[in-house]
Amino acid sequence: MAKMESGSGSDTGLIALLIQINKALHRRTSEELLGMRLKQFLLLGYVGDRGAVSQQELETGLVMDANSVVLLLNETEATGWSVRKRDPADRRRHMVELTEAGKLAVARAEKAREGIEDEVMSDLSAEERKTLRKLLKRVLEGLLRVPAESTSQA
């Protein structure tokens, strides 16, 4: 594994560390998720966990804009992993479901993700992993509660 280049040693800010981790993980997962991009994996996993979901629910749940969700759905439909159907209760709305091929692709990618996570987190104990997961969830929840505009008005 490559050594981290942080510039200022232990003074590296949390945001900088999170960005470095994000870039390294994105590169690693993109290479190893069996031909599936990370965003595709997140979308398919979200749908797989919940069953049929609306495009609007995907926007909210994945913290993505409508155009990005549509482009991503176009990709996952083209690969045969998902399908959009009209909602019988509201014909204006589309519901997204996984195909059988999509369910298989998610299962394969999930196994790869577990292996990557075990390798990446190998220096942490089970308790440290649990703590890290809790802390990162709290940070994410806080970010989702605070509108982006309020953070830029300093």
Where are these regions (language model features)?
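The alpha-helix within a helix-turn-helix
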Residues: 59
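Short alpha-helical elements of helix-turn-helix
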Residues: 12-16, 36-45, 67
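N-terminal leader segment of winged-helix/HTH proteins
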Residues: 1-35, 154
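Short capping segments at the starts of secondary-structure elements
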Residues: 50-54
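Short, locally clustered residues in the helix-turn-helix/winged-helix DNA-binding domain
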Residues: 19-22, 45-49, 110
